[in-house]
Amino acid sequence: MTILVIGINHKTASVAIREKVAFSAEKRVEALAQIQQQALAESAVILSTCNRTEVYFHHKAIPPQEAESWTARCMQWFAEIHQLSLDALAGCLYSQQNQQAVLHLMRVACGLDSLVLGEPQILGQVKDAYQLSKMYYQGQNQPLSSEFSRLFQKTFSVAKRVRTETNIGGNAVSVAYGACSLARQIFDSLKTLNVLLVGAGETIELTCRHLLRHGVQRIMIANRTFERAQHLVTKLDGAENVQVLALTQLQEGLNQADIVISSTGSPTILITQDMVKIAQKARCDLPMLLVDIAVPRDIEESVGELDSIYHYTVDDLQTIIQRNLVEREKASAQAWVIIQQECADFFEWLKVHQFSNLIRSYRENAEDIRQILLEKALLALRQGEDSEAVLQALSYKLTNKLLHSPTQVMNAMVKTGNSTGLALFSSTLKSDVE
């Protein structure tokens, strides 16, 4: 069995190149059909995210001497389906085969090859890619091979083990996630809290998604452009818990908020100490977390001097993130050990699986020979031939037929000097080979 991965990622290609080789769901189906039609592989899985595009090929019958030319054909196809030349992808496109390809897949699924080390979303994306291919091949009445299916199932279990046994995903390494982690440290639960988000950019969107996943009771989004905030809400799951405010309603939002996270491009302060004092009075001095991730600042620095106020800036978050990155690097080293162990385990299984198929085929072939010769012998007996002569002929033909292939193998071993193989044959015959 030969496994090949070809692709590009954020380490090898710019956004401009990555955009050109992205696969939509429809284009993935078209690509899988082309791979079949051109006999490039028996099965394939296509992973396409904002940071990587990779195609995993599986072929049972690529001889080692043809592996290089097969890889070249797959790379040429990859360029052509995106209407690019290979020269346009020079230095961007990479390939790995067999053990290195499996190690690469496991690293990707565990988040070790991600832009944000250890990010969990990639595992779901690999699962989605696998499911799409599985459904495609089922629709063609050609299910994914047991070997390829086993590889992806093994990869998913490896990722789960890495998440369980290491702290690869336990420390915030993005500003949005860091802000949410701070909130979870300060408050026992987010489910009864009101959150005010100021701004409607990418960081606020990511923060909002994190908060919704953790079951925040209510989110208010205040933005200078009301329509942009409304558009953001339409992209969210759980939007029924999200309310849009005009920036003129900022004080109203502060008065209700347990958590305030601000990230705008405003050149001036938006939230002053006096505004927070008013909010404290309205909230009966309940604890309040304010996280300012804007540059320049959105929240007046002196806010942190007030009682019951937890105030953090983007610099505070960066310090936390850098510390957490060090922890994730340690965890990634532990994860790599697990991946190498599990990769070796997969190839052990593959070896046994392939030889069990060989043994089964050999025994089925022997049974076919037995049935053919037996039918001929029974026919001869029914036609009145001497039974002893028929049995002698049956045993002679059966012996010759069954020993023909093993004899050829032993002759080949003698010619190549394969003493180990000859010794194994010898042990089964309980005789010495000189």
Curated annotation (Swiss-Prot):
Substrate binds at T49, C50, N51, R52, S114, E119, P120, Q121, Q125. The record marks H104 as: Important for activity. Pathway: Porphyrin-containing compound metabolism; protoporphyrin-IX biosynthesis; 5-aminolevulinate from L-glutamyl-tRNA(Glu): step 1/2. GO terms for molecular function: glutamyl-tRNA reductase activity; NADP binding. It is an enzyme of class 1 (oxidoreductase). PROSITE patterns: GLUTR. It catalyses: (S)-4-amino-5-oxopentanoate + tRNA(Glu) + NADP(+) = L-glutamyl-tRNA(Glu) + NADPH + H(+). The keyword Ion transport does not apply. Keywords: NADP, Oxidoreductase, Porphyrin biosynthesis. Gene3D superfamilies: Glutamyl-tRNA reductase, N-terminal domain, NAD(P)-binding Rossmann-like Domain. SUPFAM superfamilies: Glutamyl tRNA-reductase catalytic, N-terminal domain, Glutamyl tRNA-reductase dimerization domain, NAD(P)-binding Rossmann-fold domains. Homodimer. Belongs to the glutamyl-tRNA reductase family. Possesses an unusual extended V-shaped dimeric structure with each monomer consisting of three distinct domains arranged along a curved 'spinal' alpha-helix. The N-terminal catalytic domain specifically recognizes the glutamate moiety of the substrate. The second domain is the NADPH-binding domain, and the third C-terminal domain is responsible for dimerization. HAMAP family: Glu_tRNA_reductase (MF_00087). Catalyzes the NADPH-dependent reduction of glutamyl-tRNA(Glu) to glutamate 1-semialdehyde (GSA). This is Glutamyl-tRNA reductase. It comes from Pasteurella multocida (strain Pm70). The lineage of its organism: Bacteria, Pseudomonadati, Pseudomonadota, Gammaproteobacteria, Pasteurellales.
